[in-house]
Amino acid sequence: MSSSNTPSSSAAAAGSIDSSAARRNSKRPKYSKFTQQELPACKPILTPGWVISTFLIISVIFIPLGVISLFASQDVVEIVDRYDSACIPLSDRANKVAYIQGTGNKSCTRTLIVPKRMKQPIYVYYQLENFYQNHRRYVKSRSDSQLRSVKDENQIDACKPEDDFGGQPIVPCGLIAWSLFNDTYVLSRNNQGLTVNKKGIAWKSDKEHKFGKNVFPKNFQKGNLTGGASLDPNKPLSDQEDLIVWMRTAALPTFRKLYGKIESDLEKGENIQVTLQNNYNTYSFSGKKKLVLSTTSWLGGKNDFLGIAYLTVGGICFVLALAFTVMYLVKPRRLGDPTYLSWNRIPGGR
């Protein structure tokens, strides 16, 4: 009885081994040089010639780019006028916050002198300093769905504390919209008005996709504490470009935002009179306000950093290339020389 069962049990065991081996083989991934990391690779040896040539090529590319970038930046004509302190009457400078929160006249006149001929278009910016739009609570205090669609005007959960007024939703809600910049500028030259075009200052993608054409302001700036500018309740949010520009928050505490464009040339030596309303409260957080008039170049606005960065990197690479060249010529070293091994250089070394 037992002898007759032995072959069958051994056959079953062999069958199970074969089936388990087949299962393992069926799950094995297809062999390829890519999955096994066996692709051919080139590993260049860093010989002195290669190192010197690399540094030299970088310097030859970067130094001219730095010079070109600096020249492009120097072609930009810029007028910057800080007015937050100058537009406070002497009698009120001891308590600037009380002045800016008062109801008195805050009109101020500034005179700007054009240093060089400025070709159109001339961009008018306002610049704020020490204003942290990147604060987490500030950045989150908005409702993108509410800005896009009138159906979502009640989506105000993220907008506290500027979410509703009298139980009705505020549109647009949140701290970003509530703190909308509200200083205004009226420019003139030779006693004639200088038109500042405020159309087309916002990104087209923001106007078309982030702010609805059928969404209108509601209950905006009706609270006890006014944060900034008011909005026209008869204009859809997609047409309120000052708001759209402001809602694109800045990453750094010093930033500029586009106010408008001057579409006529300004000649050297001309006096530009600016009548401004100093309404925006930057005094509570020791902020600064500046009015900026600027042209542009093919590289953008005035920014010396890019050119200086290119010149610095190119100069360092050139110095390193020169140093390695001198070392190679004065004290050359044969590649792969075993005398430089530690146990050959130091007696008894390991």
From Swiss-Prot:
Primary subcellular site in the record, as a coarse category: Golgi
**Disordered: annotated segments:** 1-32
What are the TM regions of this chain, as residue ranges?
51-71, 305-325
GO BP, sorted A to Z: phospholipid transport
Compartment annotation:
Golgi apparatus membrane; Prevacuolar compartment membrane; Endoplasmic reticulum membrane
Pfam families (alphabetical): CDC50
Q: In which tissues is it expressed?
A: Expressed in roots, leaves, stems, flowers and siliques. Found in petals and sepals, but not in reproductive tissues. In siliques, detected in the upper part of the seed pod and in the area between the seed pod and the stem, but not in developing seeds. Strong expression in vascular shoot tissues and in stomatal guard cells of young rosettes leaves. In roots, expressed in cells surrounding the xylem and in central and peripheral columella cells.
Q: Taxonomically, which superkingdom?
A: Eukaryota
Query: Which residues are annotated as modified residue N-acetylserine in the UniProt record?
Result: S2
> Which UniProt keywords are given for this protein, alphabetically ordered?
Acetylation, Endoplasmic reticulum, Glycoprotein, Golgi apparatus, Membrane, Transmembrane, Transmembrane helix
Q: What is the membrane topology here? A: Multi-pass membrane protein
A GO cellular component annotated for this chain's UniProt record is: endoplasmic reticulum membrane
Q: Does the keyword Membrane apply?
A: yes
Carbohydrate attachment residues: N105, N182, N224
**Which InterPro entries has this protein been placed in?**
CDC50/LEM3_fam (IPR005045)
Q: Where is the composition biased (Low complexity)?
A: 1-22
Asked if the record carries the keyword Nucleotide-binding, the reply is no
| Subunit-level organization | Associates with ALA3 to form a stable complex. Interacts with ALA2 in a heterologous system.
Q: Any idea what job this protein has? A: Required for the lipid transport activity of the ALA/ALIS P4-ATPase complex.
PANTHER family found in the cross-reference section: ALA-INTERACTING SUBUNIT 1, CELL CYCLE CONTROL PROTEIN 50
Family note: Belongs to the CDC50/LEM3 family.
Q: What is this protein identified as?
A: ALA-interacting subunit 1
Native source species:
Arabidopsis thaliana
Q: Source taxonomy lineage?
A: Eukaryota, Viridiplantae, Streptophyta, Embryophyta, Tracheophyta
